[in-house]
Amino acid sequence: MFTLLRCLGFGVNEPTNTSSSEYVPEYSVEEISNEVAELDSVDPLFQCYKHVFVSLMLVRKMTQAAEDFLESFGGEFDSPCCRVYRLYRHFVNEDDAPAWAIPNVVNEDSYDDYAYLREELDAIDSSFELLNEERELSEITDRLNALRFFPVSKTEALPVANVQEVKLISETYQLLMTFINYSDENIPSEMPAPLLDELGMLPEELGPLNEIEDIKPVAAPITLLSEFRASDNAKPLDIVEIIPDVSPTKPYEAVISGNDWMTLGRIIPTTPVPTIRDVFFSGLSRHGSPEVIQNALDEFLPLHHSIDDKYFQEWVETSDKSLDVDPCRIDLSVFNNWQSSENCYEPRFKTGALSTRKGTQTEALLAIKKRNMNVPNLGQIYDVNSVANSVVNKLLTTVIDPDKLCMFPDFISEGEVSYFQDYIVGKNPDPELYSDPLGVRSIDSYKHMIKSVLKPVEDNSLHLERPMPATITYHDKDIVMSSSPIFLAAAARLMLILRDKITIPSGKFHQLFSIDAEAFDASFHFKEIDFSKFDKSQNELHHLIQERFLKYLGIPNEFLTLWFNAHRKSRISDSKNGVFFNVDFQRRTGDALTYLGNTIVTLACLCHVYDLMDPNVKFVVASGDDSLIGTVEELPRDQEFLFTTLFNLEAKFPHNQPFICSKFLITMPTTSGGKVVLPIPNPLKLLIRLGSKKVNADIFDEWYQSWIDIIGGFNDHHVIRCVAAMTAHRYLRRPSLYLEAALESLGKIFAGKTLCKECLFNEKHESNVKIKPRRVKKSHSDARSRARRA
């Protein structure tokens, strides 16, 4: 026991290696010596108890056990055990000790002169989370060796005996060793009965025994590898290579799987891409007749069958027009032929599918007027910078997980140069395209075109309004190849640092089925937001939100300044159709930032209007201008006016349905016993596309294969019933009579290519190809017969 006290800093030996600057305590060494001598004068059995008691105190979690031991063996204030306890509590943690256990043995000011001892004492107090007995013994020994250098007077420092002399576990007291390596199995039977009773009353959380038992056995230890490896000439935070190790990426698997599995495949190339093949489909016991498809279309869209737009473009091109457009320049010398020379199959069903549009000056002007000009000004913002800062701060705290973000450097660096290499794979670009950097290129100049294929019209307005084609504004190839990889790297980083409830389904595999099925089933209300004129309604506020958020993601500031300054005012030219005009902050629908920028704007709007951190919100999905929020209780609507007054957007909240990206979401069981969120395409849009007017013999095989991939989810009666019910409620507000039968007939229609042609284009599809009529020369006999009849 005397040796133990000397290890704690007390003793009576002669001083060695002291300096004159050391603090002189107010008490004398003789007082401590008398107390130590009194402690050593007790009988051997009681000294054994003291050894156990001191060992308990050395384990930080056993403080309560030491107090219980004190009450049973020497609970009186003047007993030797009580004095040892007071001395220990004073040196280890004075703040936690009771008032009676703080004696004036050592002046508290002496700690200020020995900072190294303060650090050791703090380490004793904070690091007793021991995982096994071996580590416990080694740490106790290290701390005892550190405490040996604690001086107690100005002229003397009391040395401790050598490590060989410090024998906490002697042959006489084997009980101490067995107690330090304590467990239910190795408590000796000869231990005194009162001590056994006390041990049996100890709470389970006091010792590290439960932590040891909670450790699960593993087949092999996990090797911790460095996540990044720096190059010789790189800056400290540059990334050269991401080592494909499972352990650093394990926290990201859930968030990557809910967004883009191609990003995870870049980090771990052996990762399999998930599919819906694991979904359990019961199959169809019957197939409907293809003739019911027309009945289903007439039920939902009663006037579509009467509309044939074959000659609509001829009427537009040959009629007088009066357009109210913004300032633009028109080259009237440009004229393009709008007549089509393609030989396409004539569809059998009258679904209201639109014909292909040809790019002409008139079509370009009509599309530009609708998509780019006459921008609505609904917002009421007076200090754009302060509002942008507020919106971005709310977006960062809501969407970004700081624990995931800290794994990345502060900026996108040389490690992500692989995005440039992957982008040009298979493109074989001209080397001259890389001759000039972006700084000397005209980033503010865009080209323009219209989309020839129009989206299906899903409402009953086809007989009232002629749909306009969408427009595309795009850069030259050299600018696209230099800028797209930067935004791809930023998008990958964004998907890696999202919070668990946020999902951005994107990439080659649009993984809506990776949404958390448990969170989806726990949601009873779904907030679907339909933004109108989303691209052209964006103004300076959206411009600043994107710039500051992308800077936070690590895109270099020089590139962001160059890019967004060029987007303040841009020149757009459609030289093929002879139309030239300017735009300011609105979205360029074909540049490298279109999808990522729209997604950032959508998330910023949602975060500012709704409290997405509320536990009531179970999941949030954002993809471009589409969004869906699942909640337990209905979201408050008192701030939804901010979509219009603050963000200058026309927002509609049509239905309480799990619908996003033209897909209905339902949960389905899997063959492995789990469940998954299954996205099913909008049935009404599929039925309209069955009457496509642009299918010919050259593209039929690809068109047929795309349909096989689309209708794979309709191989189950439960899926068909659920989706048909949601579609009928969405468009009719009542049950449908024909939709289920029409969806059941899809499997029969696409059972084979020959049958598909017979069902959709006619029984003999070869004779159903458009053939230009040719003039037949009339014979003289025909002329004589007509004259005879006359």
Swiss-Prot record:
Keywords, sorted A to Z: Nucleotide-binding, Nucleotidyltransferase, RNA-directed RNA polymerase, Transferase, Viral RNA replication
Presence of the UniProt keyword Nucleotidyltransferase in the record: yes
EC number: 2.7.7.48
SUPFAM superfamilies from the UniProt entry: DNA/RNA polymerases (SSF56672)
GO molecular function per UniProt: nucleotide binding; RNA binding; RNA-directed RNA polymerase activity
Comp. bias intervals (Basic and acidic residues): 779-790
CDD domains linked to this entry: Bromoviridae_RdRp (cd23252)
Domain RdRp catalytic: 524-639
Intrachain disulfide bonds: none
GO biological process, one term: positive stranded viral RNA replication
Domain of life: Viruses
Region: Disordered, residue numbers: 771-790
Pfam family, one: RdRP_2
Enzyme class label: transferase
UniProt catalytic activity: RNA(n) + a ribonucleoside 5'-triphosphate = RNA(n+1) + diphosphate
Family, as annotated: Belongs to the bromoviridae 2a family.
Record's function text: RNA-dependent RNA polymerase which replicates the viral genome composed of 3 RNA segments, RNA1, RNA2 and RNA3.
Assembly, per entry: Interacts with replication protein 1a.
Protein name, entry field: RNA-directed RNA polymerase 2a
Native organism: Alfalfa mosaic virus (AMV)
